[in-house]
Amino acid sequence: MDNYEKQVYTGRELFLKYDQDKLIEKYGLKQDEEYLYLKYIGTEYRINRRNGAIEYATGEEWTDCREYTVVMTIYDFLCCSGQEILPPFTGQWQPVGRFVTAGSSPSTDPFVEKYARAFSGKVEEVKQACICLGGKQTKRLAGADLTFEMPVLPEFSVLFQFWDGDEEFPPKILLLWDKVSLSYLHFETTYYLQGDLLKAILQIIG
């Protein structure tokens, strides 16, 4: 068993320690006797209430989820907050680096730039992909070609912005987070979620 698998099993064990009825109420989850259900970046997932395993919907079938970033983001979302009542979202958006002291967060520039280049010249395709994932287009901010509020988890959204490139400037992506986001996720998990969202958009536009 590699380190990733060990951490996934640790996530399962952590999830199983929680009062699932409280999680259902806290996050408004659909549920039955065997599973809890939630949507993550446009895909339906279910969590086995007995062993914590996560599966995703593929048509009429359910498939074991082996994507480390997806699994750990779902576990973290459900188990991160020790607060019985979560703070309401403020609608005040900020970059992820604002949550930490200067110089202490890893740079995501090369990672994000890869997706920005892939999206270059495809504003309409990116727009349609965001809509396909449940995104709601909002007013343009800071001159971005696209600004979308993207629902990524139950009642939890991020703001996705894309500037297409031209002769003077390269394409650019910026993800913004509500200022209370770290009441819902650990800081490290925001990087998993960001990667999963950009990957999902790219898969749709091809």
Residue ranges and their predicted role:
Residues 24-50, 139-164:
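Amphipathic, interaction-prone secondary-structure segments
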Residues 45, 100, 111-116, 142-144, ...:
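Domain-length accessory/inserted modules outside core catalytic folds
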Residues 74, 78, 194-197:
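Short amphipathic C-terminal alpha-helix that caps PH/PH-like domains
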Residues 178-206:
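A recognition module on extended beta-rich or small alphabeta surfaces enriched in W/G with H and D/E
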Residues 121-183:
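Conserved binding-pocket/active-site segment within a compact domain
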Residues 44-69, 163-188:
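Intrinsically disordered, low-complexity regulatory segments enriched in Ser/Thr/Pro
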Residues 64, 116, 146, 150:
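Short, charged/polar micro-motifs that form catalytic or ligand-binding hotspots
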Residues 1-34, 40, 70, 77-134:
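Short Lys/Arg-enriched alpha/beta "domain-start" segment
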